[in-house]
């Protein structure tokens, strides 16, 4: 980050930066921390898909139950522990020292167009949902591919902070699921279940994976069509075929009410 921002400075007359992030006071700021800065620093306990008994949010859960008991260090949590303090300090330091001007006032939705402008050398972590935009043809205005559509970038392993130990999660990805409410009339529930089978069927899922590049089936990522397309996807296929994919996990069961907690988390 320091090398590109302070040593290289310019490439072909264009100012370049070694980092991209965002810092606007908005709910997505909370995502930035709980999604990966905290887990990469080593907040929480060893455990997959999330730490046990303390997850990457720093929330401790009673052993053998689904009862969260606290996030403060004084209550056995880690939300204000050394790893969390380190993560937020580094996020702030890198944002102000190495990211483009104005990044501190951007939110999640403003940072992606800035990233695809082509003058940011690297990002400490990103969401694979960005891939489709980053491999779009140059004719669409995307500056992160060459004239032949080959990515001018490469996905790399998530970096590890000083408090990270083997066996911890290391990154984040959303995991979709179908929720069928008991309160929904049975005939409608059956219809929803049938539709779900269609959506996750191999044929539909493979097509969806090629369009959105968000993989949900093992058969999708191992399909020969993805082997053929892999050179154009900057490491996405290799990542999802590697053991590292299990280190990227969604928010876990220690978080009792995500919408309510997410609303207050970023403000603190």
Describe each region flagged by the PLM:
Residues 2-5, 46-105, 149, 158:
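Glycine-centered hinge/linker elements that transmit conformational signals in sensory
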Residues 121-126, 133:
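Paired acidic/hydrophobic, glycine-rich loop segments that form the ligand-binding mouth/hinge
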Residues 4, 111-115, 130-132, 192, ...:
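Short, hydrophobic alpha-helical packing/hinge segments within bilobed ligand-binding/sensory domains
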């Amino acid at each position: 980050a320091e090398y590109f921002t302070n040593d290289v400075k310019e490439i072909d007359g264009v100012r370049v930066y070694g980092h991209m992030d965002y810092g606007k006071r908005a709910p997505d700021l909370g995502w930035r921390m709980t999604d990966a800065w905290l887990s990469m620093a080593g907040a929480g306990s060893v455990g997959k898909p999330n730490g046990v008994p303390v997850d990457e949010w720093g929330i401790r859960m009673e052993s053998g139950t689904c009862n969260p008991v606290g996030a403060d260090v004084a209550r056995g949590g880690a939300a204000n522990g050394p790893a969390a303090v380190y993560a937020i300090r580094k996020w702030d330091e890198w944002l102000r020292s190495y990211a483009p001007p104005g990044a501190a006032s951007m939110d999640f939705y403003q940072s992606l167009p800035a990233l695809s402008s082509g003058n940011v050398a690297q990002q400490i972590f990103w969401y694979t949902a960005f891939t489709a935009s980053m491999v779009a043809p140059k004719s669409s205005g995307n500056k992160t591919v060459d004239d032949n559509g080959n990515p001018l970038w490469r996905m790399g392993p998530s970096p590890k902070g000083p408090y990270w130990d083997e066996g911890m999660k290391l990154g984040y990805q959303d995991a979709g699921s179908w929720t069928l409410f008991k309160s929904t009339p049975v005939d409608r529930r059956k219809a929803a279940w049938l539709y779900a089978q269609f959506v996750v069927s191999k044929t539909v899922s493979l097509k969806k994976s090629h369009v959105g590049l968000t993989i949900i089936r093992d058969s999708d990522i191992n399909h020969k069509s993805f082997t053929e397309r892999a050179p154009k996807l900057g490491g996405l296929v290799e990542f999802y075929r590697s053991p590292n994919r299990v280190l990227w996990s969604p928010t876990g069961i220690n978080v009792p009410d995500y919408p309510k907690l997410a609303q207050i988390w970023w403000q603190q």
